[in-house]
């Protein structure tokens, strides 16, 4: 930006842009470099829970027309997870008789034998979910 090693202005110096706004939203993704700097500079994590991560799976199903309701959105929480593990699902009925079916589980689960993929498979056995995707 036109500064030498000591921070003095060189011949090609041009000042940086000044940004003035009532609200500024930084959305660079999960744990981005700018976000880390802002959190540190403004102490944004003081007294806050740390960021949490999860693993998710998504499948696209073409289902029977009688089970399809274009535009329907469903979200669930919990089952088949135990009470100490958080997670949930989404089911989006898209066009063309398609359903986007997904499940997300927080990566802080305590059970070392828990398989997020297997939990997603088990989720699809719930009677309400099985009814939607049956024959798909």
Predicted features along the sequence, with ranges:
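Predominantly flavin-linked oxidoreductase catalytic cores and closely associated redox partners
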Residues: 1-134
């Amino acid at each position: 930006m036109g500064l030498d090693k000591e921070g003095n202005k060189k011949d090609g110096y041009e000042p940086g842009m000044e940004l003035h706004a009532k609200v500024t939203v930084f959305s660079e993704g999960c744990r981005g470099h700018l976000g880390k700097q802002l959190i540190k500079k403004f102490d944004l994590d003081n007294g806050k829970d740390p960021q949490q991560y999860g693993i998710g799976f998504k499948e696209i199903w073409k289902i029977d027309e009688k089970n399809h309701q274009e535009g329907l959105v469903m979200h669930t929480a919990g089952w088949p997870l135990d009470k100490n593990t958080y997670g949930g699902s989404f089911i989006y009925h898209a066009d063309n008789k398609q359903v986007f079916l997904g499940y997300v589980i927080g990566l802080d689960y305590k059970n070392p034998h828990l398989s997020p993929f297997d939990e997603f498979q088990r989720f699809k056995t719930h009677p309400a979910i099985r009814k939607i995707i049956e024959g798909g």
